Curated annotation (Swiss-Prot):
InterPro entries: Globin, Globin-like_sf, Globin/Proto, Hemoglobin_a-typ, Hemoglobin_oxygen_transport, Hemoglobin_zeta. It comes from Anas platyrhynchos. Residues 1-141 form the Globin domain. PROSITE patterns: GLOBIN. Belongs to the globin family. This is Hemoglobin subunit alpha-D. The gene is HBAD. Heme b binds at residues 58, 87.
Length: 141
């Protein structure tokens, strides 16, 4: 459960991400592919080389979905319902991968934002990403 303070910190953090969504999203995907090569199996039709147009495009989609979730912190289930359906029923992505990508996204934030990514912000964003992963996995039950 996100507290009022968590929501405030998440919103502040996302303001820092604005303008870097494609960059951060694609870098998070690249990190995931390197650290967890088994995740590449969900992208057989992608050119997975660093900086490829497909990875940049999907990274932008990931970051946009997270941005949409940030705007709907009080109703993540509704905000992510279509995405949950897509990943559960069409793409059949193993839900563990949501947590892997969340971890990689946090590494990207820490690397780019440095001191602006405070321990409090990190903790709040970790709770947020856990909530997002849980919502995306809801349809698997």
């Amino acid at each position: 459960m996100l507290t009022a303070e968590d929501k405030k910190l998440i919103t502040q953090l996302w303001e820092k991400v604005a303008g870097h969504q494609e960059e951060f999203g694609s870098e998070a995907l690249q990190r995931m592919f390197l650290a967890y090569p088994q995740t590449k199996t969900y992208f057989p039709h992608f050119d997975l080389h660093p900086g490829s147009e497909q990875v940049r495009g999907h990274g932008k989609k990931v970051a946009a979905a997270l941005g949409n979730a940030v705007k709907s912190l009080d109703n993540l289930s509704q905000a992510l319902s279509e995405l949950s359906n897509l990943h559960a029923y069409n793409l059949r992505v193993d839900p563990v991968n949501f947590k892997l990508l969340a971890q990689c996204f946090q590494v990207v934030l820490a690397a780019h934002l440095g001191k602006d990514y405070s321990p409090e912000m990190h903790a709040a964003f970790d709770k947020f990403m856990s909530a997002v992963a849980a919502v995306l996995a809801e349809k698997y039950r």
